């Protein structure tokens, strides 16, 4: 697949900069007034990719020390620590891998967090859409790794971290993972020339040194994302599981434990594709235009329903996708066996289910 960086730069008005928003930005208004500019609903599959080069993690942590985000809005402070967030949306303009709604997903999820008055202290945005308000740069391989290092860097007990990715996910043949035949990958905007980002490297950046008392939530709205973080515990329950039936977490992987409280919500299982819809307004979030099905369902669930448990949140998202005719099944995995009846939150640490074998 060819990649015309010149074409992309013509479409994008944002280049890499240290950070800082050009004044207050009303993301709620943006999220509620998305203009339909994209192609009809289509699922694209990149296929099995060549194994990418490994990431020099230490180099990017050094770069992250001089990387900054910005405070997007005023909200009651998260008193126990700092709330830091990273948003990545990639439409792959001017390539055969072009998608239509990934940057809209970023607008929608930010608008959702603003409407819920989530107290974000520092935020960074990587998108390839021209004129995206507050964007820090393009979602190149180097930038994504650098900003993931920024997100994690210096996190201490009481801090809250959030990351949302919407774009292509793919996989490559595993070389050392004895439990899986494939490693999952994120596809940056320049993946055809620079390579993808392995799940092993994402784990090394975000999770390997995470301290106890740090809360991290990661949302992947992309194909083959069910085990993108290689977390040890996952939600167990059939696609048709009802809210009245108690589900549970189960250890599916030995090793890859981390001290922090990590929740991953993915758009689909490893073997599935994640859909891009042409009319997000049908999901009732107030948005119009193209957007990822899983992102729209999650945003709707967070906005419209209060006091959901972790299990209820996942089942509500799955049910909405099923009613809309999608076959993908969103997944929930974690660093610890969460008590799934605990109230869903982006900020609190987990209650552990003592019945789950560790």
Curated annotation (Swiss-Prot):
Q: Which GO terms describe its molecular function?
A: cysteine-type endopeptidase activity; metal ion binding
Q: Which GO terms describe its cellular component?
A: cytoplasm; nucleus
Might you name a Gene Ontology BP term for this protein?
proteolysis
Q: Which UniProt keywords apply?
A: Calcium, Cytoplasm, Hydrolase, Metal-binding, Nucleus, Protease, Thiol protease
* Active site, per annotation: 168, 223
Q: How is it modified after translation?
A: In epimastigotes, the unprocessed enzyme appears to be the main form. Auto-processing is dispensable for catalytic activity towards small oligopeptide substrates.
Q: What protein does this entry describe?
A: Metacaspase-3
Whose protein is this, by species? Trypanosoma cruzi (strain CL Brener)
């Amino acid at each position: 697949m060819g990649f015309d960086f010149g074409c992309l730069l013509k479409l994008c008005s944002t280049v890499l900069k240290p950070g800082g928003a050009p004044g207050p930005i009303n993301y709620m208004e943006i999220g509620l007034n998305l203009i339909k500019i994209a192609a009809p609903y289509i699922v694209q599959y990149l296929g099995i990719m060549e194994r990418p080069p490994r990431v020099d993690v230490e180099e990017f942590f050094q770069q992250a020390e001089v990387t900054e985000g910005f405070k997007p809005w005023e909200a009651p402070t998260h008193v126990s620590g700092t709330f830091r967030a990273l948003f990545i949306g990639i439409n792959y303009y001017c390539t055969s891998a072009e998608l239509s709604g990934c940057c809209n997903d970023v607008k929608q999820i930010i608008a959702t967090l603003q409407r819920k008055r989530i107290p974000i202290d520092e935020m960074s945005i990587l998108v390839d859409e021209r004129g995206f308000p507050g964007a820090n740069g393009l979602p190149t391989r180097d930038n994504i790794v650098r900003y993931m290092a920024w997100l994690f860097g210096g996190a201490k007990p009481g801090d809250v971290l959030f990351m949302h990715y919407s774009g292509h996910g793919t996989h490559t043949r595993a070389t050392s993972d004895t439990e899986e035949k494939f490693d999952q990958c994120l596809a940056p905007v320049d993946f055809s020339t620079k390579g993808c980002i392995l799940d092993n490297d994402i784990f090394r950046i975000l999770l390997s040194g995470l301290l106890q008392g740090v809360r991290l939530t990661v949302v992947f709205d992309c194909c083959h994302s069910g085990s993108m973080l290689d977390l040890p515990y996952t939600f167990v329950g059939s696609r048709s599981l009802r809210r009245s039936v108690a589900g549970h977490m189960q250890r599916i992987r030995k090793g890859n434990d981390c001290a922090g409280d990590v929740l991953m919500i993915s758009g689909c299982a490893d073997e599935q594709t994640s859909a891009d819809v042409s009319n997000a307004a049908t999901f009732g979030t107030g948005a119009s235009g193209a957007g990822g099905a899983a992102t729209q369902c999650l945003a709707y669930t967070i906005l419209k329903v209060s006091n959901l448990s972790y299990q209820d949140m996942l089942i509500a998202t799955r049910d909405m996708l099923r009613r809309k005719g999608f076959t993908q099944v969103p997944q929930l995995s974690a660093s610890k066996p969460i008590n799934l009846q605990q109230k869903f939150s982006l900020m609190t640490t987990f209650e552990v289910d003592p019945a789950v074998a560790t």
